[in-house]
UniProtKB/Swiss-Prot annotation:
Subcellular location per the Swiss-Prot or TrEMBL entry: Cytoplasm; Nucleus
Annotated gene: Skp2
Domain of life, per lineage: Eukaryota
This protein's UniProt keywords: Acetylation, Cytoplasm, Leucine-rich repeat, Nucleus, Phosphoprotein, Repeat, Ubl conjugation, Ubl conjugation pathway
GO MF entry, a single one: identical protein binding
Keyword presence, Ubl conjugation: yes
Protein name as annotated: S-phase kinase-associated protein 2
Short motif (Nuclear localization signal): ranges: 67-73
Protein modification: Phosphorylated on serine and threonine resudues in response to DNA damage, promoting 'Lys-63'-linked ubiquitination of NBN.
Positions of the UniProt region annotated as Disordered: 52-73
Coiled coil, from the record: none
Length: 424
């Protein structure tokens, strides 16, 4: 065998040009692959999942000539992005959330507690819009929480009607401006809240019917602001301080529909405060608590109370040491009196309490500290019709009774709460 010598490749700089033509006999493909120990791949069917509909139609008609790809002139405008077709909803059984009407979604959202409602509000824009619907925010319970005043304002702006927030902490300054609230029932008892913040919040409340500010530091502007709530029915200012007798007079003169009033134990009340209060009591009051004023409440004040509030059903004058048994005839003028509290009125002689048993409408009598334990049973036997010393605390104008587990506010159960067990 004679080998042919390789020809010298000419220099590129020369004028000689060389062209190579590659060819392959397709019949030898299987022989070559067999020698390599592999086999040829079978021709797969065309995967139409990622191919646009236009190309699919061309694949169905092989006789049609293929489209020539036009080479662009360097411009990006010649490129076209073809989107993958959406999957048919028929592949997914059930009803889509997007097809549910707003009313049905609101009904579902109404079964959620506050943490879950806040969570679903972040799903999409539609759910966020629905989560702000006023029907979901009728009642709110944030008792015992550390709240920023701005957060409280935003929540009230969502249309809250009943707001239960006792023993909470809102000491930070209130910054943003806000509009009027729809709240009608509010409990801020024993909270730590800045006087300025409290004034700003209450100044936007003009529809209050029930309000409890027990134990809070107030001011004359705050008390006068409350006077704009002409529909106020229950007011609890027990243990409050920081306002003058003129503010008390303005408040009671404006709230002409009051039914329950608790002005007990306002520790900076003077004799003038008590006189201003009793002189402006509306005649609609049926439950009144003016206990805790020791020497500042006189018999003359009791006479004024009886005259201005003839429809009293429940009266608490405990810890008024200036009251004696000579004031008993005044109680007989109250034709509807059922519950009377005279605890720790030490100048009342225990034996004279038998006279109160002659009040035909009277049902309960609280005389803690007056009757010794040894003679209490004798008094109960002498007055079998009355329940004596059956309640340690007053319920007048107070929003929540029984225990801290009670989430009601004047009989209204708050639906939105941070407690998980209320969720479905």
């Amino acid at each position: 065998m004679h080998r042919k010598h390789l020809q010298e490749i000419p220099d590129q700089s020369g004028n000689v040009t060389t062209s190579f033509t590659w060819g392959w006999d397709s019949s030898k493909t299987s022989e070559l692959l067999s020698g390599m120990g592999v086999s040829a791949l079978e021709k797969e069917e065309v995967d139409s999942e990622n191919i646009p509909h236009g190309l699919l139609s061309n694949l169905g008609h092989p006789q049609s000539p293929p489209r020539k790809r036009v080479k662009g002139k360097g411009s990006d405008k010649d490129f076209v992005i073809i989107r993958r077709p959406k999957l048919s909803r028929e592949n997914f059984p059930g009803v889509s959330w997007d097809s549910l009407p707003d009313e049905l979604l609101l009904g579902i959202f109404s079964c959620l507690c506050l943490p879950e409602l806040l969570r679903v509000s972040g799903v999409c824009k539609r759910w966020y819009r629905l989560s702000l619907d006023e029907s979901l925010w009728q009642s709110l319970d944030l008792a015992g929480k550390n709240l920023h005043p701005d957060v409280t304002v935003r929540l009230l702006s969502r249309g809250v009607v009943a707001f239960r927030c006792p023993r909470s902490f809102m000491e930070q300054p209130l910054g943003e401006s806000f509009s009027s609230f729809r709240v009608q029932h509010m409990d801020l008892s024993n909270s730590v809240i800045n006087v300025s913040n409290l004034h700003k919040i209450l100044s936007e409340c003009s529809k209050l019917q029930n309000l409890s500010l027990e134990g809070l530091q107030l001011s004359d502007p705050i008390v006068k602001t409350l006077a704009q709530n002409e529909n106020l029915v229950r007011l609890n200012l027990c243990g409050c301080s920081g306002f003058s007798e003129s503010a008390v007079a303005t408040l009671l003169s404006s709230c002409s529909r009051l039914d329950e009033l608790n002005l007990s134990w306002c520790f900076d009340f003077t004799e003038k405060h008590v006189q201003a209060a009793v002189a402006h009591l509306p005649n609609t009051i049926t439950q009144l608590n003016l206990s805790g004023y020791r020497k500042n409440l006189q018999k003359t004040d009791l006479c004024t109370i009886i005259k201005r509030c003839p429809n009293l059903i429940r009266l608490d004058l405990s810890d008024s040491i200036m009251l004696k048994n000579d004031c008993f005839p005044e109680f007989f003028q109250l034709n509807y009196l059922q519950h009377l509290s005279l605890s720790r009125c030490y100048d009342i002689i225990p034996d004279t309490l038998l006279e109160l048993g002659e009040i035909p409408t009277l049902k309960t009598l609280q005389v803690f500290g007056i009757v010794p334990e040894g003679t209490l049973q004798l008094l109960r036997e002498a007055l079998p019709r009355l329940q004596i010393n059956c309640a340690y605390f007053t319920t007048i104008a107070r929003p929540t009774m029984d225990s801290k587990k009670n989430l009601e506010i004047w009989g209204i159960k708050c639906r939105l709460t941070l407690q998980k067990p209320s969720c479905l």
